[in-house]
């Protein structure tokens, strides 16, 4: 499996703190960026719109009521086919979920990005807690991750993980 990091205009849609990921893609965080700056650096400064789908019947286009298209607003990229009750969880909301905890010193921004041409997105924060060791030299780090599928195939997911998520191989 490849990393599946999205590239828009030759620019990887990912940010990271600390060590450069194995794939060498993304933009290094300095540690003082705001949530909005990180969202922009990660190429996640766009929204998802829900648009109707149509089918051709007897030469005329008729709205198809059982599904809609999820579409990225900045470039009209089709992200998926979703049900009529599906509501997008915007990238900005993902960062807003973590913002109060980062601002209060409970965690710090670590990685964020877009996979599969914008269909999947994630944001990872490292908790400001002491790392654990199961055995000497085997350090366990503590992260919180929020991931989301704009393609209608993955619900919003929040969880804790000891894994530094930097690509599709480790997440979603």
What are these regions (language model features)?
Residues 93-172:
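Intrinsic disorder/low-complexity polar-acidic segments
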Residues 1-97, 106:
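Feature for intrinsically disordered/low-complexity regulatory segments and propeptides
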